[in-house]
Structures are given as structure tokens and as C-alpha cells.
Amino acid sequence: SGGGEGSGMWFGPRL
């Protein structure tokens, strides 16, 4: 997961 799961500054949208 990415931004929609972690904090919002990991991979992007929801990767």
C-alpha cells in the first residue's frame, strides 16, 4: 500500500 494506507508519503496513491 502507499499514501492511502500508511501516512500519505510512501509510494504515491495506493500501491
UniProtKB/Swiss-Prot annotation:
GO terms for cellular component: extracellular region. Keywords: Amidation, Neuropeptide, Secreted. The keyword Transmembrane does not apply. Its main location: secreted. GO terms for biological process: neuropeptide signaling pathway. The modification Leucine amide is found at L15. It is found in: Secreted. It comes from the Eukaryota. One of its GO terms (molecular function) is neuropeptide hormone activity. Myoactive. Belongs to the pyrokinin family. This is CAPA-Pyrokinin.
